[in-house]
Structure formats: C-alpha cells, structure tokens
Regions:
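Acidic-and-aromatic substrate-binding clefts and catalytic sites of carbohydrate-active enzymes
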Residues: 44-49, 70-83, 106-111, 162-172, ...
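His/Asp/Glu-enriched short active-site or ligand-binding loop at hydrolase and phosphoryl-transfer sites
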Residues: 169-215, 252-263
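Bacterial N-terminal signal peptides
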Residues: 10-20
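Histidine-centered catalytic micro-motifs
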Residues: 98-105, 168-170, 223-226
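Active-site beta->alpha N-cap acidic-glycine motif
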Residues: 28-135, 143-161
Length: 270
C-alpha cells in the first residue's frame, strides 16, 4: 500500500512538473494518498514564538494554514507590520497557506435586528481596540478582506478564501455575510483545540500533549496560536514538535486546508 501511494505521488509530481495537473487536482491527489489527515492551523498572537514554530514546521516538513490578524506583538508593532513581513514571506515560500482572522481581530458580540444585516463587533486590535460598535455586513467584510489583502501584499501569494472569526464567535447571519463577500468560515474540532490559551497552572504542557495525542482523530482541524500573552509556560515549541512526531507515529499526515474536503470546492470556485 505504501509503495503504491509513493508511485501515485511520483506520477502526479511528474505531471505537475509538465504542466498537465492543475494545483486543485494536485491537492485532491495528495489528500487521496493520505489516509489519516489532520489540518494544523495557527492563529496570530504576540508572535514571540513564531520563529520557533517555523523552525519546527520546517524540520518536520509540515505545512499548515495560518489565520492572520494585525494583533499587538512583543516587538511593539502588529503581526502584519513590516517587521514581520519577511517571516510571512518565508512561510509562503515553504508552501504554507493563509487565511484572514479579520484585520482588527474583531469579535462578534451580537446580531442587530433589522435589515440590512448588521452586527455588534468588538475589536481587540487596531484603533477601535476594546470598543464595541455596530458594523454593517460590508464593514465586516472589509475587515476580513483587509487582512487577506495585506497577506497577499507581503507574501506574494493569494490567501485562501477562508477566514476564522476570533474566538470562534459567530452567528448564522454573520457567516452568511462573510460568504456573501467570498469568505467561508473555518472552525476547529473539539479535540483539535490544543489548549495553548488555557492557564498553564491548571493545564500543563504535558497534560495538553497527552490529551491531544489521545483524542485527535482523522479529519480534525487543529488550532494553536503564535503566542498567548496570558500563558506563562508557552505551549510551543514545547508541545508542538512532540505532537507532530507523536501523530506521525500514529499514522497521521498533515495537510493544509486547501486539501480539506469541506473547503476544496469553495476554494476552487473563489
């Protein structure tokens, strides 16, 4: 079985090199040769651990999907500023994928009754940090698009037409608005919540690693961050490499969301 998968992969690589396979078909072929896929994703954070995360991913030959917002960083700027632009460009060159996390890390708080749809939104970054206000669907879409456009500008790579709402806080109306402007929401699996936002006093890295290795299942979308201000004992890189190695030993393989069956058609049509 393994040799058959290798032969199939080699054939597609040759076809890709010759220009006879389009990227979407390549993604489907890769997914077909991966029997136990998981989809590791990272949301932005203070970025203090970002170089270490990149080192682990490169060493383990793992591609991931990053969801980016312009969040405050330990370098006194934001995670999409010029200081971090080379870091993002390097991740693109390695074959990682990108999506929006809303530019201002904008939390949905509630729907506003009436038409057209509008929402109570509270950003945790940018000039309106901590201030709740009403946004129209167009304003919310513009904030999603602003992050995507910035990623494209600094990486030279078109981000996926996907986004992750901060905190996973959404409503049907909010998701419909986002899809209406070309962005499909991506959450995460219950077992895929890797726990790096939890207090390290109660949830040690050892405990989180054991829990993840015991509960993650094929097809799960996994969630971690590029630095959490409140966690005293950082989850990465302490848990990241052991998690990747442990999942590989269990027969799992890592794929980006470009290859996820729930999003392939959406990506191809947008």
């Amino acid at each position: 079985m393994a040799s058959a998968r290798r032969r199939a992969g080699a054939a597609v690589l040759l076809a890709l090199a010759c220009g006879t396979v389009v990227p979407g078909a390549w993604a489907q072929q890769r997914a077909a040769t991966c029997e136990k896929p998981v989809y590791l994703t990272f949301d932005t954070g203070h970025m203090g651990i970002a170089p270490l995360v990149a080192d682990v991913l490169k060493r383990q030959n793992v591609r991931v999907t990053f969801f980016a917002a312009a969040e405050r960083t330990q370098t006194d700027g934001d995670s999409l500023d010029d200081h971090w632009a080379p870091w993002w460009k390097a991740r693109a060159a390695e074959g990682n994928e990108f999506g929006s996390h809303t530019y201002d890390h904008a939390y949905w708080r509630a729907d506003v009754k009436g038409t057209p749809p509008s929402f109570r939104i509270k950003p945790s970054a940018g000039p309106q940090n901590g201030k709740e206000s009403t946004w129209s669907a167009a304003e919310y879409c513009a904030n999603i698009r602003k992050s995507s456009d910035r990623l494209a500008a600094i990486t030279g790579k078109k981000p996926l037409p996907l986004y992750r709402a901060p905190g996973g806080k959404t409503s049907p109306a909010l998701l419909a608005a986002a899809e209406g402007c070309g962005y499909k929401y991506v959450g995460w699996a219950p077992a895929g919540f890797l726990g790096d936002e939890l207090p390290s006093e109660k949830f040690s890295n050892a405990k989180l690693l054991t829990q993840a290795l015991d509960t993650i299942r094929p097809g799960d979308i996994l969630l971690a961050h590029l630095g959490i201000w409140s966690r005293k004992d950082p989850w990465a890189p302490a848990d990241l490499e052991p998690l990747i190695v442990g999942l590989k030993e269990k027969g799992f393989c890592f794929r980006t969301l470009r290859e996820h069956p729930a999003y392939r058609d959406w990506i191809a049509s947008h």
